[in-house]
Amino acid sequence: NGKPEKGTLYTGNGDKGLTSLLPGSQVSKADERVAAIGGAEESVAALGLVRCVTVCPDFAGKLVRVQTTLRTLAAGLADPRSGKFVFSSEEIAFLESDTDRMVGVLADKRGSDWQGALPGGCEQSARLDAARSTVRRAERALIAMDRRYAVPGAFKVYMNRLGDWLLAAARYADWLSEEEKDKAAREPVAAETAPAAAVVPAPADAVPVGPTVENVL
């Protein structure tokens, strides 16, 4: 009969260029709302690529926090009337305070031109820069949607702050990577210049010690 079997992922509606935002409603995939929701979902995926190479548990936790907020934002765009999908103003405050913290360090260590570094200083910063480009594109889609459909002000502010946070995070990752490289380069030099340990000759009547567990380990 051409209908999908129960339990399958596909419905066939998308074959005609349509998709569902709410149960029972279908809109064109070219609709501004679909573009904005898709942009938020792309941003979640891009941040997942950053998280794959993140070894710092604290920063990994921040990425999960942002991904979770973006999913709430996407759901809110799909179902704006329900009022169920909202996030606290603390999420915006978190981005602002963490951005200020990183910018403060970068300004102190790199000077006022810290933003000018090219992407690619390390893998994590490159992925952060790519994620920032995705977020900025999603923000533009959100603004395009707002011209036709009302978008909550907090959503627009959040996407704008998120782009700033990712810029600061990318340059911060570059700085941390360079600090680690400098530290690694200094360590061999320190080892070479360290004074050699004095060798004390054993007494003539010393008895050789066999390979016990203590002196093997």
Please place each PLM-identified region on the residue numbering.
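Phosphate/pyrophosphate-binding loop motifs in nucleotide- or prenyl diphosphate-using proteins
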Residues: 1-217
